[in-house]
Amino acid sequence: MPARETERMMKLQDVILKAMAKKLKRGPHRRRRPRRPMPGMLLHIDGSKHRWFQDDRYYDLLVILDDATSRIYYAQLVAEESTRTVMTALREVIEREGLFCALYSDRTSHFFVTPKAGEPVDKSRLTQVGRALKELGVQMIPAYSPQARGRSERSFGTWQSRLPQELRLAGIATVEQANRFLRERYIAEFNHKFTVKAAERGTAFRRCGRSDLGWIFSIQTERVVAKDNTVAIRDQWWQLDKTRWRHTLAGQTVTIHQHLDDTVSIRYGPHVVGRGKDGAVENQNQVSPRSLEIASGDSHFSTASTTNPLSPKPKAKRVA
């Protein structure tokens, strides 16, 4: 064999060996996880930040889809994926479709507590979303890589290539218009085109007979009532009036419920002892004073007066 031909063969073998070594280093090819056989067994929730309009504005598209069929149950544009927007989405799906078995998500802070980056989640410490789903008996499953969320990731690739053009053709340039378009038209068209048939007949969704979803899907924090019968909510202290049934709640633990409609409720055990409005539930800015009204219909604690029974008191410190 001529020297030139021998040299060419050696180079070719070297290339082949390097390619084989690289393939072995990568390890086995990741196989796609089989779909769950029935709708309602596993739902995916994920958000995708993208320029959905014909300008430089970025919004998160929050989507909930079924693992068995890829059917979209929820898709809305939000300023940012957060505890409140996730709770809003989950509540809507549960009210319309029913309770599902498990939710698959990434490990962002509104889903899971991760003590250290790269480590497993701490399932003993629940986020607000985790607490709500535990109350409803829904399992939460964390994804540890983008590849593990392949089904939702592939779906977002389709959304990002199609939705901006659809919005442009429809002359839509605001979030409100876009969300209405998604609800009234686009989700149905998307499902008609991309939904697949489930492996098994039937559904794992079960009717939700709970009438307290508004309480479950609220941001809950506990506070100890101060000696002067006040409660700290953000940067304001609220005065609780004396009641005929109990002179004071000082020293007792109450639960502050910050609802998705920006209202606030104060509960002592099963009893609602105050309600009001708070437009800065997740805003770190100072909350302006707002009156809270005792909800007599929800509590056996009758109030001595019905005029502004809970009023803000300016103080410099919080309840411990």
Roles of regions detected by a PLM:
Residues 1-26:
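Double-stranded DNA-binding cores of transcription factors and transposases
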Residues 15, 46, 64, 70, ...:
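Mobile genetic element proteins and their domesticated derivatives, centered on retroelements
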Residues 21, 27-45, 50-51, 115-120, ...:
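Basic, flexible linker segments flanking DNA-binding modules
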Residues 27-72, 79-89, 95-100, 131-135, ...:
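Mobile-element integrase/transposase regions
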Residues 55-56, 107, 235, 270:
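Residue-level detection of beta-strand-connecting loop/turn positions
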Residues 90, 94-122, 143-146:
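Acidic/histidine-rich, metal-coordinating catalytic segments
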Residues 122, 128-200, 204-215, 255, ...:
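Charged alpha-helix within mobile-element recombinases
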Residues 185-318:
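C-terminal, beta-rich DNA-binding module of retroviral/retroelements integrases
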